[in-house]
A protein has these predicted regions:
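Sequence/structural segment immediately N-terminal to covalent heme-attachment motifs in c-type
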Residues: 23-47
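Post-cleavage N-terminal segment of exported redox proteins
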Residues: 1-26, 77, 103-107
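Extracytoplasmic electron-transfer domains, predominantly the class I c-type cytochrome c fold
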Residues: 32, 48-50, 56-107
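Ubiquitous "structural anchor" signal
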Residues: 14-17, 38, 59
Length: 107
């Protein structure tokens, strides 16, 4: 009986620990999310629209704000206060942001 209770407790603990983990971004879904970004950002070439081209973004040393190109800094830019680009913090879900970043990493 004790063994059963311990096993159930361990299974519950593992389930709760895994439930909080975010899913990895999905490239195909990220491409769809990017459609909202495409009026201002280019991914086909290096030409600038209203915002910078995002082609090869994760191959660059720095973002336009001077910060190093990392997933965290790109997510922070997506969540920006709206001075440099529209404020997407409350528009896109965390999963959509992860999907978008996964897509941008393929460019």
């Amino acid at each position: 009986m004790r063994l059963t209770i311990c096993c159930i407790g361990a299974a519950l603990a593992l389930t709760l620990a895994c439930a909080g983990a975010q899913k990895k971004g999905d490239v195909a879904r990220g491409k769809v999310v990017f459609e909202a970004c495409s009026p201002c950002h280019n991914v086909d070439n290096d030409s600038r629209k209203m915002g910078p081209s995002l082609k090869g973004l994760f191959k660059r040393a720095k973002l336009e704000n001077g910060k190093k190109v990392t997933e965290e800094n790109v997510r922070s830019q997506i969540n920006s206060d709206g001075r440099q680009m529209p404020h997407y913090q409350d528009i896109l879900s965390d999963q959509e942001k992860g999907d978008l970043i996964a897509y941008l990493k393929t460019l």
